[in-house]
Amino acid sequence: MQNGSNVTLIAPRRIGKTGLIHHVFERMKTADKRVQCFYVDVFPTKTFSQMVQFVANAVMGKLDTPSQSIKRKLNNFIAALRPTMSPDPITGAPTFSFTVEPENARETLTQVFEYMKESGQMCYLAIDEFQQVSNYNEIGADSFIRSIIQFVPNVHIIFSGSQQHLLSDMFMSPKHPFFNSSQIMTIKEIDVEKYGTFANNFFKKQGREMSQDVFTYLYNMVDGQTWYVQKILNRLYRTPKEELTKKTVNNAVGIILAEQEINYQNNYNLLTENQALLLTAIAREGVVNAPTSLDFIMRYRLPAPSSVKLALKSLQDKEFVFQTEKGEYIVYDRFFGMWLKRLE
């Protein structure tokens, strides 16, 4: 980022990419107080205009200096955005929120980037779950975004997302506007030994110690996925008098699953019979290479391969199942997978 490159950050959800982005931004702001960093999560957006509204709310008004009048900014940049002004509850400084109409979305996004350009400040913008752009009905939304950002030299962007196949296609396929427009980066699991040492530093402050063997056991339960590891560690940290053993790890996981019982039951009830059968089979298997193979189908009494294929696609679309880089299929939510294994 400091060398002027845009970055595409690809990683499964809950491995820690959002935390990494915020950490990098904090490091950059510490190194240079003049830089401006903005984070926008566009996962909830369904339309291009909603995405533009999210970006506008994150950026507009944040680069003003005390000497710059609100009126000038309203007149020059944001009058068309239907701004609503309110005082910041802590500083008292004016803050803005915006409503973007679909017919004004392109003009608005142009104004947002023009605002950053005119500020003269070095700006870093992270757009998380950027693959949502590919789902918008707006024709040419990705082409327009690319055309805007390439002419703003003081703005550098992190395109982040969790749906690897969509992001890879957007940034690595010659038929898409973002082809070769950024540096592709992926996040892997934290090294188990380094992670164990890091976690143990906190337990030592409680007068306890977790052996590397126990931590590796915990780590492997959830495939080293950061959010799940942290969830278990947090549960263990809240019981400072217990010895840190594999048994206490299992107890902690049991409590977590019990807390989510209603949510998991509701998710399960929303599935069709074929989807539920396949998802449970994948959970019990752990990792599945060929879900439509005769061996797998017979072992778990699944329907015909064509029905399994249809159920698999639906489970992937709903993000119940994730396909790894190796082409293997796993239950996306590791705790949900553990809960499914317990079903009769």
How would you name each of these model-derived features?
Residues 117-124, 132-137, 144-175:
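Sensor-1/coupling segment of RecA-like P-loop NTPase cores
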Residues 3-7, 11-15, 19-124, 155, ...:
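P-loop NTPase nucleotide-binding core
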Residues 215-221, 227-241, 277-280, 313:
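C-terminal helical "lid" of AAA+/P-loop NTPase domains
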Residues 169-220, 242-243:
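Helix-loop-helix "sensor" segment of P-loop NTPases
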Residues 215, 238-260:
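Conserved C-terminal helix/linker of AAA+ ATPases
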Residues 27, 144, 235, 314:
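Alpha-helical DNA-recognition elements
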Residues 258, 262-344:
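C-terminal leucine-rich, beta-strand-based interaction scaffolds used for sensing/assembly
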